[in-house]
């Protein structure tokens, strides 16, 4: 590593705890298969004074999705073999069911099951396990759009895949991850941590701010193939090094995961096999983030540079922004986040519907405005 690269990375990494304050965090940079940065700080559990270390287990949340697709591709050369299984799991659907690849590419047309449960009145902090998930999925009658024609981020696409893989193989998903991913990659501490209330080593996710203080986040969701991965920084480093080591193998797992994906009309899709496909600083990037109350993570890979970045926060700071800053430092380019230039508008703000308890937030965007719909928790006196 050159002196200039070392200095840029050291400055960017040392700034993370200041720019993104919270109980703890971790960051790694892998270049040409070599680990340039492996750094942790703060506490994995502030109450017990457990330090955040490279071996601390972390709730990776939706980064799980690429690993679920990795198991899928490892076990089935043609995932379309599972199309009938998808249909069987949507017994009340009144139209043709999506196929397995539609699930893997977030092109299924399904509506997110946890969001649907909240809209039906389920409490945000209530228990949402296997029974609750199956009830929502089994009740699906219609789709948002015809499969393969559009994109919508839906967690149960990957829950369905992991459930189907379990049924097809007769093995639980934790075992499938172990044999298809963790063992070959060398992810020695990685586990399926489906129950989100606690991590087995005591690592805690926090919500709050420096001004208000941080408190342990409350989660009662049961994630599997959609967001159940528990992994350490060292486990994620092993994944990035595996990606680099297999880069020249056309049948290598990550090469298969990052093969170009299109919609039905042939237009390139921005998401496939549990990975976002985008461009940062003029380079093609595959990446994904993870988020749950108290947890934020982000990993990205720039194949043309043989470069990977991993960021993990056990608090709710934007890990994707931190990863972008580290990537910019590694590439030696300025980090210039987009700042909307539209003039103030009366429509910008948050609006509440009293009848439904839903809120809509409008804010500036590069070509106009974005609309975000959020569920507002009930307030008690």
Task: Show which residues each predicted segment covers.
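Catalytic loop of the DD-peptidase/beta-lactamase superfamily, centered on the K-T-G motif
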Residues: 1-40, 166-167, 171, 175-179, ...
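Active-site-proximal loop and beta-strand segments within enzyme catalytic domains
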Residues: 3, 19-25, 31-34, 43-155, ...
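Short, conserved clusters of charged catalytic residues that mark active-site
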Residues: 8-12, 85, 160
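Secretory-pathway/luminal and periplasmic proteins that interact with or process carbohydrate-rich
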Residues: 36-37, 93-100, 108-116, 184-194, ...
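Solvent-exposed loop/turn segments at secondary-structure junctions
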Residues: 110, 158, 315-317
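Non-cleavable N-terminal signal-anchor transmembrane helices
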Residues: 178, 190, 196-198
């Amino acid at each position: 590593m050159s002196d200039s690269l070392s200095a840029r990375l050291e400055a960017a990494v040392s700034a993370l705890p200041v720019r993104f304050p919270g109980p703890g965090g971790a960051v790694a940079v892998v270049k040409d298969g070599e680990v340039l940065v492996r750094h942790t700080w703060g506490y994995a559990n502030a109450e017990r004074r457990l330090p955040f270390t490279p071996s601390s287990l972390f709730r990776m949340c939706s980064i799980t999705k690429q690993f679920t697709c990795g198991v899928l591709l490892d076990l089935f050369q043609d995932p379309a073999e599972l199309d009938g299984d998808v249909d069987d799991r949507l017994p009340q659907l009144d139209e043709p069911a999506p196929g397995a690849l539609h699930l893997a590419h977030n092109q299924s047309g399904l509506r997110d099951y946890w969001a649907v449960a909240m809209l039906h009145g389920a409490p945000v902090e209530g228990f949402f396990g296997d029974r609750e998930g199956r009830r929502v999925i089994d009740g699906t009658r219609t789709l948002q759009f015809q499969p393969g024609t559009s994109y919508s981020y839906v967690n149960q696409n990957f829950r369905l895949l992991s459930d189907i893989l379990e049924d097809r193989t007769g093995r639980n998903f934790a075992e499938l991850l172990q044999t298809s991913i963790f063992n070959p990659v060398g992810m020695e501490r990685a586990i399926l941590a489906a129950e989100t209330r606690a991590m087995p080593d005591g690592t805690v996710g926090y919500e709050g701010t420096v001004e208000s203080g941080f408190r342990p986040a409350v989660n009662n969701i049961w994630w599997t193939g959609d967001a159940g991965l528990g992994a350490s920084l060292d486990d994620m480093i092993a994944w990035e090094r595996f990606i680099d080591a297999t880069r020249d193998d056309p049948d290598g797992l990550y090469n298969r995961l990052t093969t170009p994906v299109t919609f039905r009309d042939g237009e390139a899709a921005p998401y496939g096999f549990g990975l976002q496909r985008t461009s940062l600083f003029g380079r093609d990037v595959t990446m994904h983030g993870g988020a749950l109350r108290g947890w934020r993570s982000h990993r990205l890979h720039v194949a043309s540079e043989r470069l990977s970045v991993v960021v993990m926060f056990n608090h709710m700071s934007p890990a994707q922004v931190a990863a972008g800053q580290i990537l910019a430092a590694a590439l030696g380019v300025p980090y210039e986040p987009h700042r909307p230039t539209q003039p103030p508008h009366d429509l910008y703000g948050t609006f509440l519907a009293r009848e439904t308890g839903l809120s809509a937030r409008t804010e500036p965007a590069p070509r106009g405005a974005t609309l975000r719909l959020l569920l507002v928790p009930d307030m008690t006196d």
